[in-house]
């Protein structure tokens, strides 16, 4: 039995030929080993043990991979499980039902009229369009390339013409070789698994233990959905000369539908439509309006009358809907291999990254929830909250001019307790944890991406030399230089021209950032003016909570401004990017991505930065307030601190923005598609349901966003920034992000499967420029969290008081008993008679004690009015300031060291993956040698059989 032509399958004593049929020699060998009747006295277990012992002494060329042990499945085998080989009975049955299959193919709208040629691509145009000559030349050249074509008119509008394209096997093979499409490679060497007694015992004990464990609920049910099982195969670039090396069960399904569409699109991008070196490609025809749309077809309906568990999947779209896009599987893992097979590697990588990000949010959300619950459980023991709630004799100065009244410090008891929920002893730990978490997330994503790239054959994939954008060619067609790669002349942009355009673009970016700052300034003016208005409001609820009402309404107005400016920013970013005249589409995409991210990041976080680092920091003090344009007094923090304002800002913005994004992602396409169907029914003049072919159904769906996955990535990257940058002030941000992402995955899946036309299956090795942006956000989050803890929260002032000024000063303790008297020490005294005329409140405070007040308190570390330097900074202020600066420096250096250490310790490529890659390279070479040797041996046998002479070999 030769290793090069047979293999053992599933540990049984059957040997199958590499072509898939039963090998004759192996069958004869079985007959020799298994004599008839009573003569059988051979111990087969001893024979197998002997074979295994011999295998240990030779160089076994395959490791213990079950996937390598069986042939790969093609598209159809995923939907119709069973033997990959067909018997003569199966063939006759298929031939008898051939006419029925062809009729069914014609009716489902996925094939030509003959029911044999599958539609690989659709072009749409209107007969009334004047670009007739260009289309005719283009379509004539399409036929010259070997593609088959058919045209159909729309059922509801005869002006709309659908051009159906089909690529025959010869065309697919020729261009697959040019594009280096990797396909399953034929296995030539059988594998005998090594078995060690010790490992076998361990496996047996583990299997017994697993029987008592519940099934993993998040894993996809492979028993009821066997179609999800797809064997892994070694692949190699397709070659027509070595076509016999590849596993080809059916030429019609050897290239899956996504690959076929990608090959056809590749052909269309290189076909001329006019004479001239630049008059080439489908994209230019779509730009000038010659064609309205171009897209590959969905594989039929995503719904079925029968259950997928009992009748199986009707098509891959139905399979994806049931096991991925349906809300009933929200808690299960994503079938990423199926997503990649249907939508391509680029979209598959997006969902892989989104799933990885969502999974990594679980520990962050758990720790954040723990920090919040820790604040809840320690609320009754918090000395600061107790003192605030019991401070009925401490009267606070008004927080605004004229209309704001004096108030007891105890009136802010609720806000002090809420502040403790987010600003407690666990906050610093959580900030350090999140900084480390961001690094671990990125480092392990690199490892995860490497595994995915290996499984999806992206390790050695390199992007093709990109075509020059038509706009770039039109602008610089007069200046040319030789391309160092292709050796062909191409348009050239002078360095001075490029620099001048970049300067203008940078000026535009700076101007738009100034617009954001102006919007924030407007919000500040609104807060300053409104707090006085709410303080004089008739309703007691609003009057007594004027600051909270001001913050809440300001956040809502800020959200509306953010959404309006986003529309403006997109147009400005588009204008500035086109002004730069990028040479290729990838350069254009990277430039546009950076601008949009910068605009939206500043737009979304500018108000948050103001509240975190500026609100209440530069207000002055009673009697000497700082004012805007010498009129409006700057807003002060609440008596319980500014952190409550920051929490409200983050919570409201995060919830509103995620809700709006989810509506725009799913609700808006649903409404658009419903309106399109309604319009079609009205134009057709009937309310009855029309049975449209698949190409017309897909044409009525919404096209994918013009910027591809840009909006999907941008939404998640902004959320990542919101989750990490100010997480010290809002520990529940990871939990909100987790809940949103669980919904986001299914929303995006539902949108791709049901609401959008099928996008072209594109390849990509990683998430592109977004990874660098994520790294930048991770660095920024360390800095901002250090400042939030040191400046925005009261963590440092409490720490200084406990060690320096409290009852435990000098004892090295910092418990709750050491915080006695902290509230009184953090408040300064102001003499009411020192108020400015325009700041003096209408009330004299007699409602508190029956007599006019002489003094009130305010948050600051200043000397009393009767001291030698009235209202000057105290020594405690300078101690707190020094401690804040020291904390920022120590925190940043410590966290950055931890981040770099983690980055150094975690390799980008897992060791087992590195070994698998090296072994695969070796195995592919061995299989190529074995396959070539087998081919030569077959040719030699054929020559001998036919009696043809051949040259003698050297001895």
Swiss-Prot record:
Ranges in the topological domain labelled Extracellular: 374-424, 527-547, 617-715, 790-885
Any GO molecular function: protein dimerization activity
- Domain of life the protein comes from: Eukaryota
| Glycan attachment points | 544, 824, 837
Q: What name has this protein been given in UniProt?
A: Anoctamin-4
Tell me yes or no: is Transport among this UniProt entry's keywords.
yes
Q: Which residues lie on this side of the membrane: Cytoplasmic?
A: 1-352, 446-505, 569-595, 737-768, 907-955
Residue ranges for the region (Disordered) are 73-97
Q: Which GO terms describe its cellular component?
A: plasma membrane
Question: What is the protein's known function?
Answer: Has calcium-dependent phospholipid scramblase activity; scrambles phosphatidylserine, phosphatidylcholine and galactosylceramide. Does not exhibit calcium-activated chloride channel (CaCC) activity.
Expression sites (tissue/organ): Predominantly expressed in neuronal tissues. Expressed at low levels in ovary, uterus, heart and brain.
The gene behind this protein is: Ano4
Also noted in the record is: The term 'anoctamin' was coined because these channels are anion selective and have eight (OCT) transmembrane segments. There is some dissatisfaction in the field with the Ano nomenclature because it is not certain that all the members of this family are anion channels or have the 8-transmembrane topology.
What is the reaction catalyzed?
a 1,2-diacyl-sn-glycero-3-phospho-L-serine(in) = a 1,2-diacyl-sn-glycero-3-phospho-L-serine(out); a beta-D-galactosyl-(1<->1')-N-acylsphing-4-enine(out) = a beta-D-galactosyl-(1<->1')-N-acylsphing-4-enine(in); a 1,2-diacyl-sn-glycero-3-phosphocholine(in) = a 1,2-diacyl-sn-glycero-3-phosphocholine(out)
């Amino acid at each position: 039995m030769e290793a090069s032509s047979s293999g053992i399958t599933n540990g049984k004593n059957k040997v199958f030929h590499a072509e898939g049929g039963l090998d004759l020699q192996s069958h004869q060998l079985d007959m020799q080993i298994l004599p008839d009747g009573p003569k059988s006295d051979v111990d087969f277990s001893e024979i197998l043990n002997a074979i295994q012992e011999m295998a240990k002494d030779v160089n076994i060329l395959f490791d213990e991979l079950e996937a390598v042990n069986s042939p790969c499945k093609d598209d159809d085998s995923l939907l119709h499980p069973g033997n990959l080989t067909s018997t003569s009975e199966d063939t006759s049955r298929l031939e008898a039902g051939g006419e029925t299959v062809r009729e069914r193919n014609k009716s489902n709208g996925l094939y030509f009229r003959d029911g044999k040629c599958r539609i690989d691509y659709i072009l749409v145009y209107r007969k009334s369009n004047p670009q007739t000559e260009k289309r005719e030349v283009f379509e004539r050249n399409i036929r010259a390339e070997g593609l088959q074509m058919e045209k159909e008119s729309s059922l509801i509008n005869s002006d709309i013409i659908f051009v159906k394209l089909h690529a025959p096997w010869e065309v697919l093979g020729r261009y697959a070789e040019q594009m280096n499409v990797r396909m399953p490679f034929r296995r030539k060497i059988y594998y005998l698994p090594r078995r060690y007694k010790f490992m076998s015992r361990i496996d047996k004990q583990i299997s017994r233990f697993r029987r008592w464990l519940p099934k993993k609920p998040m894993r996809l049910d492979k028993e009821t959905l066997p179609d999800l099982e797809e064997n892994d195969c070694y692949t190699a670039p397709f070659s027509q000369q070595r076509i016999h090396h590849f596993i080809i069960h059916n030429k019609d399904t050897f290239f899956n539908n996504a690959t076929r569409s990608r090959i056809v699109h590749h052909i269309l991008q290189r076909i001329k439509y006019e004479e001239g070196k630049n008059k080439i490609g489908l994209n230019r025809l779509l730009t000038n309006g010659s064609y309205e749309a171009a897209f590959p077809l969905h594989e039929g309906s995503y719904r079925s009358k029968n259950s997928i568990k009992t009748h199986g999947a009707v098509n891959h779209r139905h399979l994806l809907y049931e096991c991925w896009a349906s809300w009933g599987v929200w808690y299960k893992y994503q079938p990423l291999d199926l997503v990649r097979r249907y939508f391509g590697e680029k979209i598959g990588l997006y969902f892989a990254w989104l799933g990885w990000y969502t999974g990594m949010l679980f520990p962050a959300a758990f720790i954040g929830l723990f920090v919040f619950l820790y604040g809840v459980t320690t609320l009754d023991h918090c000395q600061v909250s107790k003192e605030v709630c019991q401070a009925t004799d401490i009267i606070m100065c008004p927080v605004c001019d004229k209309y704001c009244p004096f108030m007891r410090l105890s009136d802010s008891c609720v806000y002090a307790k809420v502040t403790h929920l987010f600003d407690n002893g666990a906050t610093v730990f959580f900030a350090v944890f999140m900084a480390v978490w961001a690094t671990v997330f990125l480092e392990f994503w690199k490892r995860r991406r490497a595994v995915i790239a290996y499984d999806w054959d992206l390790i050695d994939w390199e992007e093709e030399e990109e075509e020059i954008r038509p706009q770039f060619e039109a602008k610089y067609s007069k200046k040319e230089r030789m391309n160092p790669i292709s050796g062909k002349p191409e348009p050239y942009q002078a360095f001075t021209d490029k620099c001048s355009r970049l300067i203008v673009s940078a000026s535009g970016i700076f101007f738009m950032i100034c617009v954001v700052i102006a919007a924030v300034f407007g919000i500040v003016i609104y807060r300053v003016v409104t707090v006085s208005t709410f303080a004089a409001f008739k309703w007691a609820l609003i009057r007594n909570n004027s600051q909270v009402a001001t913050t809440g309404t300001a956040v809502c107005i800020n959200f509306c401004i953010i959404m309006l400016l986003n529309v403006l920013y997109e147009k400005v970013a588009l204008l500035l990017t086109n002004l730069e005249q990028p040479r290729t589409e990838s350069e254009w995409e990277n430039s546009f991505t950076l601008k949009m991210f910068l605009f939206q990041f500043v737009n979304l976080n500018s108000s948050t930065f103001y509240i975190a680092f500026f609100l209440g920091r530069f207000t002055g003090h009673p009697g000497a307030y700082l004012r805007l344009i010498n009129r409006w007094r700057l807003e002060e923090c609440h008596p319980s601190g500014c952190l409550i304002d920051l929490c409200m800002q983050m919570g409201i913005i995060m919830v509103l923005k995620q809700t709006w994004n989810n509506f725009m992602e799913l609700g808006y396409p649903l409404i658009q598609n419903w309106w399109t169907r309604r319009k079609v029914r009205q134009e057709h003049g009937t309310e009855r349901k029309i049975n449209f072919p698949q190409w017309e159904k897909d044409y009525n769906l919404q096209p994918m966003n013009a910027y591809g996955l840009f909006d999907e990535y941008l939404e998640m990257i902004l959320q990542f920034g919101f989750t990490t940058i100010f997480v010290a002030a809002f520990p529940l941000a990871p939990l909100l992000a987790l809940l949103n992402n669980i919904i986001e995955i299914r929303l995006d899946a539902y949108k791709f499967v049901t609401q959008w036309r099928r996008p072209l299956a594109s390849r990509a090795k990683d998430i592109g420029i977004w990874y660098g942006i994520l790294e930048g956000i991770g660095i920024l989050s360390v800095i901002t969290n250090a400042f939030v803890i040191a400046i925005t929260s009261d963590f440092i002032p409490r720490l200084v008081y406990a060690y320096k000024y409290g009852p435990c000063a000098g004892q090295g303790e910092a418990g709750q008993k050491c915080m006695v008297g902290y509230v009184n020490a953090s408040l300064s005294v102001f003499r009411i008679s020192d108020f400015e005329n325009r700041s003096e409140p209408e009330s004299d405070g007699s409602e508190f004690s029956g007599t006019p007040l002489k003094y009130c308190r305010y948050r600051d570390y200043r000397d009393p009015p009767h001291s030698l330097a009235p209202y000057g900074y105290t020594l405690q202020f300078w101690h707190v300031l020094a401690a804040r600066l020291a904390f920022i420096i120590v925190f940043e250096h410590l966290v950055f060291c931890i981040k770099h250490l983690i980055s150094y310790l975690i390799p980008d490529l897992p060791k087992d993956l590195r070994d698998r890659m090296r072994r695969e390279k070796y195995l592919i070479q061995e299989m190529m040698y074995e396959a070539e040797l087998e081919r030569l041996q077959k040719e030699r046998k054929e020559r001998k059989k036919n009696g043809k002479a051949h040259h003698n070999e050297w001895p």
